[in-house]
């Protein structure tokens, strides 16, 4: 008897009409007993992150057929954070994570697919696919489209963040417009996701650690042949996983998520990983909360010197041994669990067996555990009267992660950026951007344009920026995001006024305004809930159902 899930649409006399439809798309008699595997293809020419995905999808499709499966390709959406950054369009970025998850779940479950191979590139593709995979719990694998190679200008490595910072450098007189245009024309040389340890590369690493993509695959360059070979191998492994009935929730254990958190600390990953790991774990039914990040941060050092705060890009990490080399160092130090398994059915200890104990001596990207860049992880969870549920501070590259200063308050990213470019922000200020949370934005925009402008003006060490919105993986400096409760639901960030003294202290994990509980309560009585300006459409729907950022900003609690 056929035990495949797809037998619901392929077996028996009553399914003759169903089979007739499948015959039209290429099925023959013998194919109805093969596993039907969805190929969730995020190919798009919207963004360089995704423009190379179709060749990987076609390669995977061929491999599925050769390995005894029947592929069915369907499209998923993407948006480009880099293009929508600083505009109203950025409100759709985090929303797209949910759309991607919903679309993959919908297609696979509607068609009774036996497994899914998801292919993505831009930031929200990875967590979106993982949320869907956790919901469905059918054999699954993820293929990352790959990182972009660095742009070059006069021997200097460039990334997209170089262009954002150039805007601030221009307005402060540090560069001229000719230099700005040179950076613009040279920072993105081809296909692939943004090249530093930004959000896309961070999340691809998370998926590799969780065991749902192949070892070494998360750091490959998009345009290199090994990426196509990895796609071919991934499809073959997925067919085998269906035969062995290896399912995502077999791999997505609490230990596996702890491993993922350890690795993002070690590589200096994006703040967005906090939000996305919380969302994926929630969907998988795993008890991971925001406090776990701080617990693990205290033990795990940063051992990779990667942009945005460091020197190197992801292709350099790949040459130095990639995520497996980082994991081997952490495993030897007792900082990850070696008994977690991957999609091939191998434990971490098994598949890292042939990885060297020490990083190569001819590189400076990965350091050994006793010579870290920072002794503790770079993503600190801050709490206090401005964030009772927590907030996320990125403190890599910051010499003094403590600042007390007067609040400069802005009700939107646009107003803040205008003020920065007018040189209104001074050393010692605490810039506050509020009403940009999951509900208030809605959509929790990333504040890359303001933070890059601050860094470009030379204020990165002298100004703190706090928000209920998010930050790009390309952000660095003394920044605190994901403040919860957010302003739109009456969080205390909504109650502060211009000039109130705010302390950001990443050493004591503290974020607070110098106001008494009585004063905050008095202001709360006068607070008026903002009117949601989106009455129809997806942003309106999202703002009504999205959870707090401290739970991952999910929409299916």
UniProtKB/Swiss-Prot annotation:
[2Fe-2S] cluster binds at residues 49, 122, 194. It holds the Pfam family ILVD_EDD_N. Binds 1 [2Fe-2S] cluster per subunit. This cluster acts as a Lewis acid cofactor. It catalyses: (2R)-2,3-dihydroxy-3-methylbutanoate = 3-methyl-2-oxobutanoate + H2O; (2R,3R)-2,3-dihydroxy-3-methylpentanoate = (S)-3-methyl-2-oxopentanoate + H2O. Mg(2+) binds at residues 81, 123-124, 446. InterPro entries: DHAD_IlvD/Edd, Dihydro-acid_dehy_C, DihydroxyA_deHydtase, DiOHA_6PGluconate_deHydtase_CS, ILV_EDD_C, ILV_EDD_N, IlvD/EDD_N. One of its GO terms (biological process) is isoleucine biosynthetic process. The active site is at residue 472. Its EC number is 4.2.1.9. The keyword Iron applies. It is an enzyme of class 4 (lyase). GO terms for molecular function: 2 iron, 2 sulfur cluster binding; dihydroxy-acid dehydratase activity; magnesium ion binding. The modification N6-carboxylysine is found at residue 124. Gene3D superfamilies: IlvD/EDD C-terminal domain-like. PROSITE patterns: ILVD_EDD_1, ILVD_EDD_2. Its cofactor is [2Fe-2S] cluster; Mg(2+). Pathway: Amino-acid biosynthesis; L-isoleucine biosynthesis; L-isoleucine from 2-oxobutanoate: step 3/4; Amino-acid biosynthesis; L-valine biosynthesis; L-valine from pyruvate: step 3/4. Signal peptide: none annotated. Belongs to the IlvD/Edd family. Homodimer. Functions in the biosynthesis of branched-chain amino acids. Catalyzes the dehydration of (2R,3R)-2,3-dihydroxy-3-methylpentanoate (2,3-dihydroxy-3-methylvalerate) into 2-oxo-3-methylpentanoate (2-oxo-3-methylvalerate) and of (2R)-2,3-dihydroxy-3-methylbutanoate (2,3-dihydroxyisovalerate) into 2-oxo-3-methylbutanoate (2-oxoisovalerate), the penultimate precursor to L-isoleucine and L-valine, respectively. This is Dihydroxy-acid dehydratase.
